[in-house]
Amino acid sequence: MDGVVTDLITVGLKRGSDELLSSGIINGPFTMNSSTPSTANGNDSKKFKRDRPPCSPSRVLHLRKIPCDVTEAEIISLGLPFGKVTNLLMLKGKSQAFLEMASEEAAVTMVNYYTPITPHLRSQPVYIQYSNHRELKTDNLPNQARAQAALQAVSAVQSGSLALSGGPSNEGTVLPGQSPVLRIIIENLFYPVTLEVLHQIFSKFGTVLKIITFTKNNQFQALLQYADPVNAHYAKMALDGQNIYNACCTLRIDFSKLTSLNVKYNNDKSRDFTRLDLPTGDGQPSLEPPMAAAFGAPGIISSPYAGAAGFAPAIGFPQATGLSVPAVPGALGPLTITSSAVTGRMAIPGASGIPGNSVLLVTNLNPDLITPHGLFILFGVYGDVHRVKIMFNKKENALVQMADANQAQLAMNHLSGQRLYGKVLRATLSKHQAVQLPREGQEDQGLTKDFSNSPLHRFKKPGSKNFQNIFPPSATLHLSNIPPSVTVDDLKNLFIEAGCSVKAFKFFQKDRKMALIQLGSVEEAIQALIELHNHDLGENHHLRVSFSKSTI
């Protein structure tokens, strides 16, 4: 460890703590300990202790186990989707690096993203943690010329003033005034491509704000708006020409002449991820005339990535089961989503990086109202829940074990941040690999339940249509399995008695076994689903409740 300490103090790292490199690895297999000599070179042969608490968030991040031949630009590329990278310190001899983001918020977003999804550089996993240091001071230090050159190049690209290739050509660069909107055409559309599929793929390269899908000239097309033109550039650079599914659904990506999208409705054709309050509308949204005209425009077409001097085309995103964006410079393979995705079992990016981690830690629950059964019903919307454990001594926390890591990721993505019984639920991946049942005679108060063989599992049948009807929580619920004798008033009164305010209701015209009911808020709908899913309606019919993608 002395070697690391000496090197870091020599290069002028501004210390925020007396401990150096002592915090726990956020997404690594073990915790680094400052007293263990082998942390200097990332030696896996040593056993690392788990006796150190994680560092508090810092805009300086510590990267471990970086490849010995990695470039400065490749390290920088890990941080670019999350914000501006302001400094870099490489310790190649120790397979380590320090990356400084412009803000602590950007660093937190980056760590949160890479917690369940281990990033790869040159096909090698890289582990990221907060540093004890609050700032990197590398002025006038030897061997920093390459790092500073890479940072300056990236800064120039982000401001649109320099070609990535370092020459006069504008090929593969972010042009001045380049649009954050991409125009996407799907060729060889053998399998359906949904708005959710596009969001999953393109969100790997930055924050997706809006998507509009449409069909023109018998081709499925989309307009997709990023928060930043740089994100759009990287997405086009990596994804243009790639296949979504094996040997089909090829992405053809151009830059749009539009600089912003006007989304009027949130439905299966269009989505504004910044405006969850938008109505569903009927069918394809109406478009403003300039936008409609733009559908036929070629857009600002940038040439394929020409290869930058020292700048990696790969953004360092992890390979995953199914959908993968390899992080090997210059080698972008197909985005092959496994065939199981066609039946709804799409691989969630990064889930393969946490084998067997199907347990979620759910926090900030209302201890007076939450029950294991309630969590089973709610999380069961997004996968088959096997076990639930509410903490005996801290009843606002619980563990939820899903059938697999994909389902855990899906439930976490949809439910974390939702309000439930007056509190904002938080869900993260747990360090536990399974929920243990209480030993015989152990006091538990019924807080641990095994639902492994529950008949209420929604996804136990392979290829079930339920896989195609997974939607985020909304104020509108989809009701099914309604017997013929049950009336509109019967169902309205059922929800009113459960404490809900019913705003609208309608039966499906072609099938009165199904209906939509719109409640006063998303929180009301979540609580109603917990309360009334599987409610006995008589005539051997139990009500089925799920979130709807539609509004009334």
From Swiss-Prot:
Coiled coil located at which positions?
A: none
Where would I find the Glycyl lysine isopeptide (Lys-Gly) (interchain with G-Cter in SUMO2) crosslink on this chain? 65, 216
One Pfam family from the UniProt entry?
RRM_5
Q: Is the keyword Phosphoprotein assigned to this protein?
A: yes
Polar residues composition bias: residue spans: 32-43
| PTM annotation (Phosphothreonine): residues | 138
GO cellular-component term (any):
nucleus
Positions carrying N-acetylmethionine are 1
Disordered as annotated region, ranges: 32-55, 435-455
Q: How does it assemble?
A: Interacts with THBS4 (via the acidic amphipathic C-terminus).
* Function recorded in the entry: RNA-binding protein that mediates pre-mRNA alternative splicing regulation. Plays a role in the regulation of cell proliferation, differentiation and migration. Positive regulator of EPO-dependent erythropoiesis. Participates in cell differentiation regulation by repressing tissue-specific exons. Promotes FAS exon 6 skipping. Binds RNA, preferentially to both poly(G) and poly(U).
**What's the protein called, per UniProt?**
Polypyrimidine tract-binding protein 3
User: What is the originating organism of this protein?
Assistant: Homo sapiens (Human)
Question: Which gene produces this protein?
Answer: PTBP3
